[in-house]
Amino acid sequence: MLSGEKILITGPAGRIAWHITQKLAQKNEVWGIARFGNLQERREVEALGVTTRHIDLATCEFGDLPRDFTYLLHIAASFEHGSYDRAIQVNAESAGFMLEYCRSAKAALIMSTLSVYKPTPAPWHAFKEGDALGDIMVPIPDTYSIAKICEEAVARFCARSFNLPVTIARLGAAYGPRGGLPLMHLEAMLEGRVIEPRWDPLPYSAIPGDDIADMVEPLLGAASVPATIVNFCGDEPVAAQQWIAYMAGLIGVTPKVMVKPVPGASVGSVGDVTKRLGITGPCKIKWQDGLRRVIEERHPGLIKVPFA
């Protein structure tokens, strides 16, 4: 576990960064920057011992933020839709400004996404790091995959230009008590809403927040010039239909699921984890256990089925 470091995390209160922030704040000097539109979330981050600053990544006006960080974790992302110009500014340009500002760091982790891969007609295809990139073609957020491809290009340039070791981690379907696609489906079931996956089956490489946090240190250790690019996702592919059925069984409801195809869109988001396994080792949490734990954290007492 990293200790005694000075670490900057963007978006520390978010569903992806929260577990990382909790873990790293135990033995390091951690700073967190974000817009912090939710004051309560900022207080929760500061309660971990994290020093915060209100900084909008659309402008990257850093004010009195120090520069002497030993590690940068750029995790914040914009999921706004409709404007590619805005999406590229907030996701891609901000990565460049962050890496330039922290160019003296030992290493940086840039969080990308499996959504950068060009869709294939095979739902269970496991994308490898060298596969073709392209627009995932989902309607919301419609700009995301293109903006993240741009972000990767900026990060690759910065690694070489600044001689700064960088890892670009293409994150799978991350989830935890603060959110994620499985949790969106859980809330839909609780509210009696229809869940509309775009294909059947619609597989993902889901990964829980605890595994994400545990793998940050080795991913930073793998940072290099040129940048290391690696899929950062769960070991066990699982279809949305599978986790919906599993969670429905735990909470005792009948889910409403209706497939709603999206022409041209990706029909699966599974990542090949061979490269990541060589860096981090295997995940510790099976998807069933991870989802059960998250439901218990988010809705105590909701689960009707005893742990087997």
Residue ranges and their predicted role:
Residues 39, 51-93:
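NAD(P)H-binding glycine-rich loop region in Rossmannoid oxidoreductase-like domains
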Residues 123-124, 153-204, 209-210, 247:
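NAD(P)-dependent short-chain dehydrogenase/reductase
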Residues 91, 144-148:
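Active-site YXXXK catalytic motif of short-chain dehydrogenase/reductase
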Residues 209, 239-245, 259-296, 300-307:
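Conserved C-terminal active-site "lid" loop/helix of NAD(P)H-dependent oxidoreductases
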Residues 2, 6-26:
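N-terminal Rossmann NAD(P)H-binding glycine-rich loop of SDR-like oxidoreductase domains
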Residues 96-143:
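Conserved Rossmann-fold NAD(P)-dependent oxidoreductase catalytic core, especially the SDR/UDP-sugar
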Residues 191, 215-264:
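Mid/C-terminal beta-alpha module of Rossmann-like enzyme folds, strongest
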Residues 175-179, 201-213, 229-247, 285, ...:
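Substrate-binding strand-loop-helix patch
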